[in-house]
Swiss-Prot record:
Entry's cofactor comment: Binds 2 Zn(2+) ions per subunit.
Protein name (Swiss-Prot/TrEMBL): Probable cinnamyl alcohol dehydrogenase
Residues annotated as binding NADP(+): 50, 168, 189-194, 212-217, 252, 276, 299-301
Quaternary structure note: Homodimer.
Cofactor(s) this protein requires: Zn(2+)
Database matches in Pfam families: ADH_N, ADH_zinc_N
Biological source species: Medicago sativa (Alfalfa)
Amino acid sequence: MGSIEAAERTTVGLAAKDPSGILTPYTYTLRNTGPDDVYIKIHYCGVCHSDLHQIKNDLGMSNYPMVPGHEVVGEVLEVGSNVTRFKVGEIVGVGLLVGCCKSCRACDSEIEQYCNKKIWSYNDVYTDGKITQGGFAESTVVEQKFVVKIPEGLAPEQVAPLLCAGVTVYSPLSHFGLKTPGLRGGILGLGGVGHMGVKVAKALGHHVTVISSSDKKKKEALEDLGADNYLVSSDTVGMQEAADSLDYIIDTVPVGHPLEPYLSLLKIDGKLILMGVINTPLQFVTPMVMLGRKSITGSFVGSVKETEEMLEFWKEKGLTSMIEIVTMDYINKAFERLEKNDVRYRFVVDVKGSKFEE
């Protein structure tokens, strides 16, 4: 085994068959493999809140059967004849994308996540007409351009959530020039992405305030994650005292919420960076932005280049993800708990250690 040239394979995964979102075994054919492809045996796959949206058709764009999962870590089993970046036996990662046009402004700038013709790692159609399926499966085939090198020394189960949640917070801090030590940042929402935000911001030398709707995560934020301050959004006095204090806020909340209370926390030229996938309009009055030259912006995961840079940063700083490892037979329960925000802070599925039965 060493190279692959257009041989089809079957694999088995867990798929949602309808908007109930219940995952059951599903055997399917992997797309044709070619000279630029990498055949990967999946070891671990993270569970993201967007997976929950997809399996339940919350965004009205789901196609079934659907194998979710876009935080994939696995072992290279074979490579195509043109593959130069990877070799058999290496541990690699795959994130949210498996294709792009390679000729637009975004692709030319190596920010392929903003390509209008990007191809999602699941619930999409590949260039050969086959439906893409995700990481809750035994194996996958991915073009080498979208496969991520993983630095030696990083535990594979730790890497899985970094391929989405980790780079999601790292990318805007890098792009918007917010990596300077001493900045004061806010993390709105302390879930899977939010806990990554605290870790990355602290590692950059920032003063970090966690903002939440209740005080139930205060101890975790301050003692376990090392945040410097904790604000409860309903605490009028505390919010007023914190006005004009933050250089940026990373807003990870995945449901509709008012923006004005958080805009008031920003300094002049401060940035509110939206990351949650929300299918209802958000509202604010324009003076909240105008009178402080503040910005409401967004950011979407990160490029392969940014992901590899973030993984090196993670290794250099000695950071770890706070995860709960589960096997495939627990995945439906994991989604139930995720829907109730009952996870600390990210589920990772041990795919290699799971049994698949059709």
